[in-house]
Amino acid sequence: MKTYLVGGAVRDALLNIPVYDHDWVVVGATPQDMLEQGFSQVGKDFPVFLHPKTKEEYALARTERKSGQGYHGFEVSFDPTVTLEDDLIRRDLTINAMAQDAEGQIVDPYGGQQDLADKVLRHVSEAFAEDPLRVLRVARFAAKLSAFGFTLAPETAALMKSMSASGELSALTPERVWQEVVKALNTQTPSVFFEVLDHVNALSILFPALDALKGVQQPEKHHPEGDAWVHTMMVLDASAALSNDVSVRFAALVHDLGKGLTPKALWPKHHGHEKAGVPLVAALCQQYRVPKKIQIFAEKVTEYHGLIHRGLDLEGHPHLKTATFLKVLSACQAFKEVAQFESLLIACEADAKGRLGFESRPYPQKDFWLELAKRANAVDNQAILATGVKGAEIGEAIVQERMRLIEDFVREYSAI
């Protein structure tokens, strides 16, 4: 019975990336052997055990054989005769198919160290094509490791294209897709995830509303970077630089979906794309069972990012009507959820900076809207009640007072 550290922990250690999770493979053992040593079994489909002290996962070495569609369609075999090499060959990429023994020696039967040195993402074997989730996993690894200069091996890209063409991606469950999206959004350059999916023809299958942004022209004055797809990818990466919040990054990803609906005859303008995009965001969220809180936030960013930008004109002067300022503040729950409103403004800032030549420009709208919300929320409720208003009149009086406070602040801001 031998135990090996495997997978991501070995890869990340060789890349000098902090290792947070350790996965182990046990060769030459039975489930009974593990239980007798105090491990507790958690796996149903195949034996995975938790270490009695560290609670890290230890899996018996196993082989897999395709027996049906999707990533559930596998027959798993595990017994003491399964070798480490047998276990490693079923893994997705060569850089994930390395192990380390108890003495610290690297076991690398499939060239993972060479591919690490060459910065190549390469599949271990043709069995890669048996699991459609690997298309998403490899795209995610490309995003995670892009800062190190990793690229996709041409033969792996070709295999992923054939997987897209096979129809197997439709067998993926919404939860697994969303899980990979979240992991990709948490990388430094999440755009790479979607660009790889596009490269292997998976984007149009999994995210058609994003695919529809390709080639959609925008006003060159405001968007010298190119079409709505290029802009969206730049906004996504800008959001990653500004915030670690998945909600902000997801909102950045979907904020301009409405531009994909604009008739070509109206290009490069996209009047009303904000509101038009909301049903597309809702549909995507429902398709992949995105948590409701993230969906609602993304819908708010999608619907109101245009008005947030136009809160100040190009000279930095307040630009909306008082009633519109209040409408945006109320709709975005700026009075009740201050932290969430600030996150919404960060998503809008990413939108403004996700343009060629605008990456380092200040975004005064953020501080303006935060101060506007603070001022408009400084309503003296007791003073209003002291006037004797009752029932529905109280709400109306609060609205009028907020309008007055907004007007005062706008006047003050304009005089600066």
Curated annotation (Swiss-Prot):
Q: Name one Pfam family in it.
A: PolyA_pol_RNAbd
Determine if Lipid biosynthesis is one of this entry's keywords. no
What chemistry does it catalyse, as a reaction equation?
a tRNA precursor + 2 CTP + ATP = a tRNA with a 3' CCA end + 3 diphosphate; a tRNA with a 3' CCA end + 2 CTP + ATP = a tRNA with a 3' CCACCA end + 3 diphosphate
PROSITE patterns, sorted: HD (PS51831)
Q: Which HAMAP family match?
A: CCA_bact_type1, CCA_bact_type2
> How would you summarize the oligomeric state and partners of this protein?
Monomer. Can also form homodimers and oligomers.
- Other comments? A single active site specifically recognizes both ATP and CTP and is responsible for their addition.
Please report the name of this protein according to its UniProt entry: Multifunctional CCA protein
Identify the species of origin: Hydrogenovibrio crunogenus (strain DSM 25203 / XCL-2) (Thiomicrospira crunogena)
Upper classification of the source organism reads: Bacteria, Pseudomonadati, Pseudomonadota, Gammaproteobacteria, Thiotrichales
In the UniProt record, the gene name given for this protein reads cca
